[in-house]
Amino acid sequence: MSASPVYPLEGGCACGYVRYRITSPPLFVHCCHCRWCQRESGASFALNALIEADRVVHLAAEPQLIDTPSNSGKGQKIARCPKCQVAVWSNYAGAGPILRFVRVGTLDHSDSLPPDIHIYTASKQPWVVIAPDVPAVPEYYQSDRFWPPESLARRKAFWPSVEAYRAAQRS
């Protein structure tokens, strides 16, 4: 695992049709153990790097956005390769298209981004062992409590766009 990844990082789907680049470090990396992520990923958890959409650059074909239910009941749009159907990121209803949850496993060097936090550990598989030095919470969490100051400053900068998106969704 890289102690300090060099940006940009690139990734894509299994067949190579969809390729992307993340231009900066993510805000935070979640290892989500909720049953929804387990089902959607077909694995014991989903590892997602939260990053502003404008820091994710398309290098090849556009992914197809698929409306999918989520644990919150508000849904998500999963970006999948239209050929091999691999999910490369999600946009959840709360922040819409402004914030992406990039699937870390789709990065060319997926070991570059270990989890900053384990979430929904109340539903994790009992045989999954969480490193004692990584925060773990039974459900979701307050970002103000766990995110580094740089990430909180970035969130403050894009939050007006999230509010505008939410207002447009209500009208």
Question: What does each model-identified segment do?
Answer:
Residues 1-10, 17-171:
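A short Gly-Trp-Pro
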